């Protein structure tokens, strides 16, 4: 019977928020507005970094890639979410669901690795300032980012193959805003031990491994800051606050979503958290890095002054 059901599954039906039809239009307009702010804010960050020579430092090189990933990350999920709200549900073919799942994992994994690299960048800037420029040369930066992209590709391939070799039976309805692992696991049946082990290995390799790099980097940073005069401690640590804020928001939602047991999974909670990491956090990142960064604010001021003069 499971095999028959498996052969009949040719599409999935996304039904998130369909139980609240009166909220469909307000949520559609809200999420559309947030998506536009996300795209414009992150593209503005990328343009600022490309145009201002003061922002050609390693940290901003990594930040430009993070901004690009945030645009891609949101663009994979938000248009689908808007379609679900507008049409009160949306059908997604098996292949399209797998493709969305792969791209979401790809961009999300790269986000994790980039945040880890940015923590390493802050470690070098604070703990090894004399060697900072010589270690993070242009070639080194390109190699690190290329490594993040390759690791993201491998992670996405492993996770997607593991998830979509599972047997799906029963209902094909997904009470979620896009094709993601927690709701898909609720549709599985039959033997899935090997795939679940691979999925767990992915979660350990991407999320906790990135967090270990971040935590170790900041441990060394804190130790280094404790060794400098009290008057300079706040100024030195302020260079890390933007990154720490972004890390706390991003990894906090990922841990809640992916590192809990299946018994703790709630459709409503998962939907709220998914909106946080697909819409809210990518929208806030440009604000976090610009409002708390003097160099970015100065670059923005220069461009605005040029626009006024022209």
UniProtKB/Swiss-Prot annotation:
Bilayer disposition of the protein: Multi-pass membrane protein
InterPro entries xref list: GPCR_Rhodpsn, GPCR_Rhodpsn_7TM, Olfact_rcpt
Glycan-modified residues: 5
Recorded family membership: Belongs to the G-protein coupled receptor 1 family.
This protein's name: Olfactory receptor 9Q1
GO biological-process terms attached to the record: G protein-coupled receptor signaling pathway; sensory perception of smell
Top-rank lineage group of the source organism: Eukaryota
Cytoplasmic side: 47-54, 121-139, 218-236, 292-310
GO cellular component terms, semicolon-separated: plasma membrane
Chain's role: Odorant receptor.
PROSITE patterns associated with the record: G_PROTEIN_RECEP_F1_1 (PS00237), G_PROTEIN_RECEP_F1_2 (PS50262)
Keyword Disulfide bond among record annotations: yes
Pfam family, one: 7tm_4
Regions that span the bilayer: 26-46, 55-75, 100-120, 140-160, 198-217, 237-257, 271-291
Disulfide bonds: 97-189
Extracellular side: 1-25, 76-99, 161-197, 258-270
Compartment(s) where it occurs, according to its Swiss-Prot or TrEMBL record: Cell membrane
One Gene Ontology term of the molecular function aspect: olfactory receptor activity
Entry keyword set: Cell membrane, Disulfide bond, G-protein coupled receptor, Glycoprotein, Membrane, Olfaction, Receptor, Sensory transduction, Transducer, Transmembrane, Transmembrane helix
Gene3D superfamilies according to UniProt: Rhodopsin 7-helix transmembrane proteins (1.20.1070.10)
SUPFAM superfamilies: Family A G protein-coupled receptor-like
């Amino acid at each position: 019977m499971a095999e028959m059901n498996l052969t009949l599954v040719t599409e999935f039906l996304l039904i998130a928020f369909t139980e609240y039809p009166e909220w469909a239009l307000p949520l559609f307009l809200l999420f559309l507005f947030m998506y536009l702010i996300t795209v414009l804010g992150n593209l503005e960050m990328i343009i600022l970094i490309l145009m201002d020579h003061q922002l050609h430092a390693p940290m901003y090189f990594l930040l430009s890639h993070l901004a690009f990933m945030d645009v891609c990350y949101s663009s994979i999920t938000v248009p689908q979410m808007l379609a679900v709200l507008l049409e009160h549900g949306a059908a997604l073919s098996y292949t399209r669901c797998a493709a969305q799942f792969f791209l979401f994992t790809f961009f999300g994994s790269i986000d994790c690795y980039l945040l880890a690299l940015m923590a390493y960048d802050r470690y070098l800037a604070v703990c090894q300032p004399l060697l900072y420029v010589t270690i993070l040369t242009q070639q080194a930066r390109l190699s690190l980012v290329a490594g993040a992209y390759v690791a993201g590709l491998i992670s996405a391939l492993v996770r997607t193959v593991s998830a979509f070799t599972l047997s799906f039976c029963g209902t094909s309805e997904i009470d979620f805003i896009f094709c993601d692992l927690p709701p898909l696991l609720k549709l599985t049946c039959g033997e899935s031990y090997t795939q679940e082990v691979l999925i767990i290995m992915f979660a350990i390799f991407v999320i906790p491994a990135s967090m270990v790099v971040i935590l170790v980097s900041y441990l060394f940073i804190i130790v280094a800051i404790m060794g400098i005069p009290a008057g300079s401690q706040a100024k030195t640590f302020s260079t890390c606050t933007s990154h720490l804020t972004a890390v706390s928001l991003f990894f906090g939602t990922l841990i809640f979503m992916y590192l809990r047991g299946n018994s703790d999974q709630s459709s409503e909670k998962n939907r709220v958290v998914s909106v946080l990491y697909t819409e809210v956090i990518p929208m806030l990142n440009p604000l976090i890095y610009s409002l708390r960064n003097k160099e970015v604010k100065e670059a923005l001021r220069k461009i605005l002054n040029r626009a006024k003069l022209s």
